[in-house]
From Swiss-Prot:
The chain crosses the membrane at residues 22-42, 54-74, 89-109, 148-168, 189-209, 223-243, 305-325, 337-357. This is Serine/threonine transporter SstT. GO terms for molecular function: neutral L-amino acid:sodium symporter activity. It comes from Haemophilus influenzae (strain 86-028NP). It holds the Pfam family SDF. GO terms for biological process: serine transport; threonine transport. It comes from the Bacteria. Keywords: Amino-acid transport, Cell inner membrane, Cell membrane, Membrane, Symport, Transmembrane, Transmembrane helix, Transport. It catalyses: L-serine(in) + Na(+)(in) = L-serine(out) + Na(+)(out); L-threonine(in) + Na(+)(in) = L-threonine(out) + Na(+)(out). Involved in the import of serine and threonine into the cell, with the concomitant import of sodium (symport system). Its main location: membrane. It is found in: Cell inner membrane.
């Protein structure tokens, strides 16, 4: 096989098919690495795992710069008086997150789950009140712009890019062209990085399955079934209903496209931030309004947290059922609201949704000791829970953005 054919095989054709091939090869390497270790003298899965580490690192590195220039260029070049769809998208984000939490409450009662609490996890850094979560968000907004980029504080990056973009709307055309050229240049770099996704998935799958395997999840089958089942129900029932409300036609082709193109990558990177470039590429292919998606997708990565709301709710109710506590409907409804609010701030908390479990548990008087043990359970099942949560969160960002953009096209065509 010559070099050009090898390059064509590895980097051209359907990205989804190439990612699927990387997934299968990763599973194969994970299965054979242990038997081969004595023969070759090293763990093959650990060695190829560096490909996944490099891929995720590259995505996370380019994401802040991409957001900064893309949002700033889009707003600076936006004609004054042009209608914005951001209000409708934010409403969908918040509504989708609340409905996900509410569905999780129902699932938690229909399928009550108990877990064995034995291990403890440090919860000292967990926020103690909703106000603390909101305060963290405010601090992230007013962060130094260079610090926000260096530390990948996406709320801060978004705030500064929006501010500068609006301020530069009256700048000269030459300045606006420079911003657009920078945004285009970063987008091309993103395209190159995404072309390496099959290698990244290959490394991530091989290392993850070899390191933890699926044996560690055996004791939490019911909890995982309720968690993942609720997330799938949200992705394929709740979200399509919201999308149909906007586009007034069969939502499933769009839903499936977003799950396939965005959700699969997010599942393996386990990072909404790292998946922002993937979502922006998908939005381009869907021919969505750049001025809309360049803002809504980074924003969604920070506040559109249906998966996190489900995780917080299900694990909190698992603690409730394990302790044999009685919960009223009003308390459950309050849990939905608190979980949705906490989820929106999950991106501003180290450890994400898991470290917000003590906050939700405090609604029912559950001790920090028990809540900390639930965090430990979350880390054990994280190999599937965190991956599925991220896939739901990230794919919904581009899904809701597309729904609102398509609604606008439908209204303009009418």
């Amino acid at each position: 096989m010559n070099t050009s054919r090898l390059f064509s095989l590895l980097f051209q054709g359907s990205l989804v098919k190439r990612i699927a091939a990387g997934l299968v090869l990763g599973i194969v390497v994970a299965l054979i690495s242990a038997p081969l270790q004595e023969t070759i003298g090293f763990n093959l899965a650990e060695k190829v795992g560096v490909l996944g580490t490099i891929f995720v690192k590259a995505l996370r590195a380019v994401a802040p710069i991409l957001i900064f220039f893309l949002v700033m260029a889009a707003l600076a070049n936006r004609k004054i008086g042009t209608k914005s769809n951001m209000k409708e998208i934010i409403v969908l984000y918040l509504l989708g997150t609340f409905l996900a939490a509410f569905v999780a409450v129902i699932a938690g009662f229909v399928f009550p789950t108990e877990v064995v609490l034995a291990t403890k996890e440090d919860a000292s850094s967990a926020p103690q009140a909703v106000g603390q979560v909101l305060f963290t968000l405010i601090l992230n907004v007013v962060d130094n712009p260079l610090n926000a980029i260096f530390k990948a504080n996406f709320i801060g990056v978004l705030a500064w890019s929006i501010g500068l973009g609006l301020a530069l709307r009256h700048a000269s055309d030459a300045t606006k062209n420079v911003l657009s050229d920078f945004a285009e240049g970063v987008s091309k770099i993103v395209h190159v990085i995404i072309s390496f996704a099959p290698f990244g998935v290959f490394g991530l799958v091989a290392e993850t399955l070899s390191d933890k395997g699926l044996v560690a999840l055996g004791g939490y089958v019911q909890l995982l079934a309720v968690l993942i089942g609720t997330m799938l129900f949200t992705a394929f029932v709740v979200n399509p209903i919201l999308v149909y409300w906007k586009i007034r036609r069969n939502p499933y082709p769009l839903v499936w496209t977003c799950v396939r193109e965005s959700g699969v990558t997010a599942f393996f990177t386990r990072s909404s931030a790292a998946n922002i470039p993937v979502n922006i590429e998908l939005a381009k292919r869907l021919n969505l309004d750049e001025e809309t998606y360049s803002v809504s997708i980074p924003l969604g990565a920070n506040i559109n947290m249906a998966g996190a709301a489900i995780t917080i709710t299900i694990l909190t109710l698992a603690a409730v059922h394990t302790l044999g506590l009685e919960v009223s409907f009003v308390s459950a409804l309050l849990l939905s609201i608190v979980a949705a609010l906490c989820a929106c701030g999950a991106s501003g908390v180290a450890g994400g949704s898991l470290l917000l479990i003590p906050l939700a548990c405090s609604l029912f008087g559950i001790s920090d000791d028990v809540a900390a043990q639930m965090i430990g359970v979350g880390f054990i099942i994280g190999i599937l829970q965190d991956s599925t949560e991220t896939a739901l969160n990230s794919s919904t960002d581009v899904l809701f953005t597309a729904a609102v953009c398509m609604e606008e096209e439908r209204k303009n065509a009418a």
